[in-house]
A protein has these predicted regions:
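Retroviral integrase
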Residues: 2-153, 191-235
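Globin-like tetrapyrrole-binding proteins
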Residues: 136-137, 147-183, 196
Length: 235
């Protein structure tokens, strides 16, 4: 009799491998093939002085301002926030103009926010390079994304506070509170840049030194064999 006939007659003899054993064998094979990969930190930096990221912070409806136009230095991590009533191109034109006139950026990097794209000519007229990150590539926007998360974290109740997180003042950021947050952030030591954002913002030599260190590290990382993961690597 064939195996099929045996099965038809109700042959319940055990299979060579049970589903559980097959899965264990597969997992074992995976672990055998898996190669340990060292962790490498790839810093986002600019080899130009005075370059910035910018984005919009949603301050929720029925609050003043409705949005915050956030800027943060690519290298020095110095942060600026300007109040914004809406996301219209004309309103963003005003905050961009204010920022450009005061800080004279060499380059501004952002996502594809329509109000930013509508103001390309403003940047051109002021000799500001515009870099747009497409397809929501938030890895390239990590600096500004991380800072916006930091703002939210700084606007929460501390463990020692008697206040509650649902209280009105913790649901949005008022101009007074934003000023306090920025002052604290800009004057706190950052291990990434080995100084405070305010110090590097005030001293271009510190930024130049930081750029040189990042460039040197980047060149050394390029010589690492397993820096670029092959297709199929476990991460």
């Amino acid at each position: 009799m064939t195996d099929n006939n045996n099965l038809a007659k109700g042959d319940l003899s055990p299979l060579p491998f049970s589903p559980g054993k097959v899965m264990k064998r597969r997992m074992k094979d995976i672990h055998v093939r898996k190669k340990a990969i060292k962790i490498y930190m790839i810093k986002i930096y600019s080899n130009m002085l005075n370059t910035w990221f910018h984005d919009l912070y949603d301050n929720l409806p029925n609050h003043e301002p409705r949005y915050w136009h956030i800027f943060i230095g690519t290298n020095n991590k110095y942060a600026v926030a300007l109040p914004l009533n809406d996301k219209r191109a004309s309103s963003i034109h005003k905050t961009l103009s204010e920022f450009i006139n005061k800080y004279h950026p060499a380059k501004l990097t952002s996502d594809e926010e329509p109000g930013f794209l509508a103001n390309i000519q403003l940047l051109k007229d002021n000799n500001v390079t515009m870099h747009v990150i497409q397809d929501k590539n938030h890895s390239s926007l990590a600096v500004i994304d991380r800072f916006i998360r930091t703002i939210r974290d700084m606007n929460t109740v501390s463990e020692e506070s008697k206040h509650q997180s649902h209280e009105e003042k913790y649901t949005y950021i008022s101009p007074y509170r934003m000023e306090k947050i920025l002052n604290t952030y800009n004057n706190n030591y950052h291990s990434t840049i080995k100084c405070t954002p305010q110090e590097m913002f005030n001293d271009h030599n510190l930024e130049k030194e930081y750029i040189l260190k990042c460039m040197d590290r980047s060149e050394r990382q390029k010589r690492i064999k397993d820096l670029i993961l092959p297709v199929g690597s476990f991460v």
